Amino acid sequence: MIKQRTLKNIIRATGVGLHSGEKVYLTLKPAPVDTGIVFCRTDLDPVVEIPARAENVGETTMSTTLVKGDVKVDTVEHLLSAMAGLGIDNAYVELSASEVPIMDGSAGPFVFLIQSAGLQEQEAAKKFIRIKREVSVEEGDKRAVFVPFDGFKVSFEIDFDHPVFRGRTQQASVDFSSTSFVKEVSRARTFGFMRDIEYLRSQNLALGGSVENAIVVDENRVLNEDGLRYEDEFVKHKILDAIGDLYLLGNSLIGEFRGFKSGHALNNQLLRTLIADKDAWEVVTFEDARTAPISYMRPAAAV
C-alpha cells in the first residue's frame, strides 16, 4: 500500500517575508492521518488555523495567499511545492507572522528542512486525485489545463520579450516519473525585474526582496553575481510555483498540468473549475504499490 506521510520530527527555521520584510519564525510539525497541510498563525490569540485548500485562497497578487476572515498567510506556494515534491500529506506549519519566509527564493531550503525532520509513513492509504478528462481555463492569452496522464507531469511556457529571456529556454516539461523534483526543480528561484521593484515597494510589496532571495533582472542582464542555477531557471521556477499551487487540491495529482503564461490567479481558477466538475476527477488509492504511477513509489528524496 502507498501510505500517507508526515514528518518524523519537529523542525524550525527563521527567515524574512518577501513582501513584508518582517522576520518570521517557522515551525513544521507532524500531523495525524487525513489532516492535510494546515497553516497556523501562532502570533495570534487564539491561534488561527487555515487549511491549505484551494477554496481558502483569497489573494493571488504576486503570490498565493490563504485567507480566513481577516487573517492571512502569504506566499505559501514554495513551501507547498516542497511538501508536494517530497510527498508530505499531513503537517502543521506554524508561523509567527502573516507570511511564509522567502528563504533563498526557491523550495530548496524547505526541502532541506523536511528531509532533516525525516519522513514518517502513516497507517492509512495515500489519496491521489486522478484527472479523468481535460479541464481548462483561459484569461486573455494565458491558459492553464489539466489533462489525463498516468503519472505526474508539469509543462510550462513563459513568454517574456526581454533580452535576458530571448536567448533562453522559455518552455519546460517535467515528468516526475523520470525526473527528480529535488534536483531539477526545487532550487529554481523566484525572479523579478528592477523596473518593477520600486513600484512594488510603493505598494508595500517586495520589501524583503534582494539578490539573496530572488533572481533580479535589469534591462539587459541578470544582476546576481553567481548567475543562474539552471539554464532554464526562470521557467523551472514557474513549474515550482505551479506544483505548490496545485497542492492546494489537498492531495497528490495523477495527471498533467500545462500552463502558458499562467500565474497564481489562473492556477487557482483551474483548481476551482476542476473541483466543481465532479466527473473530471476521482480519488484513488493504491493497495499494491506496484500498480501505482512510478513517481509515487518511493520518497522523492531518494529519486
Swiss-Prot record:
Pathway(s) per entry: Glycolipid biosynthesis; lipid IV(A) biosynthesis; lipid IV(A) from (3R)-3-hydroxytetradecanoyl-[acyl-carrier-protein] and UDP-N-acetyl-alpha-D-glucosamine: step 2/6
Function: Catalyzes the hydrolysis of UDP-3-O-myristoyl-N-acetylglucosamine to form UDP-3-O-myristoylglucosamine and acetate, the committed step in lipid A biosynthesis.
Catalyzed reaction equations: a UDP-3-O-[(3R)-3-hydroxyacyl]-N-acetyl-alpha-D-glucosamine + H2O = a UDP-3-O-[(3R)-3-hydroxyacyl]-alpha-D-glucosamine + acetate
Keywords, alphabetical: Hydrolase, Lipid A biosynthesis, Lipid biosynthesis, Lipid metabolism, Metal-binding, Zinc
EC top class named in words: hydrolase
Names of required cofactors: Zn(2+)
Active-site feature positions: H264
InterPro entries: Ribosomal_Su5_D2-typ_SF (IPR020568), UDP-acyl_GlcNac_deAcase (IPR004463), UDP-acyl_GlcNac_deAcase_C (IPR011334), UDP-acyl_N-AcGlcN_deAcase_N (IPR015870)
GO biological process: lipid A biosynthetic process
Any one Gene Ontology cellular component term annotated for this protein: membrane
Stated family: Belongs to the LpxC family.
Record protein name field: UDP-3-O-acyl-N-acetylglucosamine deacetylase
Organism lineage string: Bacteria, Pseudomonadati, Pseudomonadota, Gammaproteobacteria, Pseudomonadales
Residues annotated for Zn(2+) binding in this entry: H78, H237, D241
Originating species: Pseudomonas aeruginosa (strain ATCC 15692 / DSM 22644 / CIP 104116 / JCM 14847 / LMG 12228 / 1C / PRS 101 / PAO1)
Molecular function, one GO term: UDP-3-O-acyl-N-acetylglucosamine deacetylase activity
Domain of life: Bacteria
Entry's EC annotation: 3.5.1.108
